[in-house]
Amino acid sequence: MRDLVQESWLRGVYVSMQTMTDTRDRICEILRATGRPGMEAVINYLLTSSYFKRGCYGHHKEYGGLAQHSLEVYEHMLTHAEGYPADSIAVVGLFHDLGKTAKRDGRGHGRRSVVILDRLGFALTDEERTAIGRHHDRSLDLLTCPLRRHLTAADCTSTARWKHAHPELCHHHHRKVSQ
């Protein structure tokens, strides 16, 4: 039996297997607690896709970073998005980057997230659909979709915290061009 404190190494960041297991279990628990129809199909997708394994581009690069980032976004939204149902916060916070598990197809990862959820038969409210599908869309006024505003703030907060904790992984190395 593998030791659960075995370390996984990627790009200079250690993540314990126990941490990854805890993150997976916590996310599944939160999602099941929503009681939303179709949630088990989405959870099965998460468990069989790269959602719990992959990192993000530009932040949370470590193995399991995507799930960790999504959990951080959810937790931030839970404390700052007052007035929204807990199930909407869970769906938006935990599924906003789901599209990063799918092959690129010309759409942004937010829109791919919505497509995946649609294919799995998971129903979204109009506001959830807009928040997830357009969370990086600068052309959409943040005031027209308050849930998207909360998602964008939480997404930026999680990313900034990771970059602050791992500055050595955020430098862009530029090649010196000779003239």
Show the residue positions of the predicted features.
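Metal-dependent phosphohydrolase cores
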Residues: 1-179
